[in-house]
Amino acid sequence: MTRLSTCTYVQEKHNLIILGASGAGKTYLSCAFGIAACRNFYTVKYVRLPDLLNELAVARGEGIFQKVMKQYKRVSLLILDDWLLVPLSNTEARDLLEIVEARHKKASTIFSSQFAPAGWHGKIGEGTLADAILDRIVHDSYTIFIDGEDSMRKRKGIQA
């Protein structure tokens, strides 16, 4: 963790996969890595995957799709929270491939998910597309698994 907080993975264009149950602290840890990257003068963008997919769909309808895509392709560190909570449509999978391909070995991405990469293939859908996306993510990433009995919200929430 200490080594990752120095942002060498961003400098080397590697990714992080942060896995754990709901409330395990994946978002907290992702944001902490994002803050560390900002402090090291990297550009950072945080977005939940459902919000990203919605933004791309709206941008496509408004004729500004390429402009919006450029924002996600150029940032030094992109944090994708709630990665693959629900299955993707073919259009969404193609959009993600475009982002992942553009960033592969050129920029870093943090993928925060409740599901292990073995389950991602089924969520992406179409086999060839899923293979292309996962190949670019999994083989160039550090993986952090957060294990714990209780939800962070349960431990840190308001006590009666």
Label for each model-derived stretch:
Residues 77:
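Short, Asp-centered acidic motifs that coordinate Mg2+ and/or phosphate
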Residues 1-74, 121:
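Conserved P-loop
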